[in-house]
């Protein structure tokens, strides 16, 4: 929002997205990107769980971010054809089980 690169100490389950921007990349984003959607870790985990429950595919948290954004902003994308690439070689099964359990407990409360 400030128009310049600012350092951030993000803490997220989507650790594959924790990268630094260089000035060249930032200038492309500033010129070409009209909107950036954000999602919470809980929304990411819900998207991961949906993919698992419906498709029996385990995806890494970073891969679930676009689906989480679609789920959060249904009205923005209603009636549109959307494609999402699912990937996920960076998956720790024990960690995913823990995330699903934590998310399940939060949804019960």
Language-model regions, residue ranges each:
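PLP-dependent amino-acid enzyme catalytic core
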Residues: 1-109
């Amino acid at each position: 929002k400030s128009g310049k690169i600012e350092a951030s100490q993000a803490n997220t389950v989507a650790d594959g997205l924790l990268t630094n921007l260089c000035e060249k990349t930032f200038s492309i984003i500033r010129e070409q990107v009209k909107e950036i959607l954000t999602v919470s870790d809980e929304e990411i985990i819900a998207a991961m769980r949906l993919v698992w429950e419906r498709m029996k595919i385990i995806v890494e948290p970073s891969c679930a971010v676009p689906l989480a954004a679609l789920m959060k902003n249904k009205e923005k994308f209603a009636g549109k054809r959307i494609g999402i690439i699912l990937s996920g070689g960076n998956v720790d099964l024990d960690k995913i089980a823990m995330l699903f359990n934590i998310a399940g407990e939060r949804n019960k409360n």
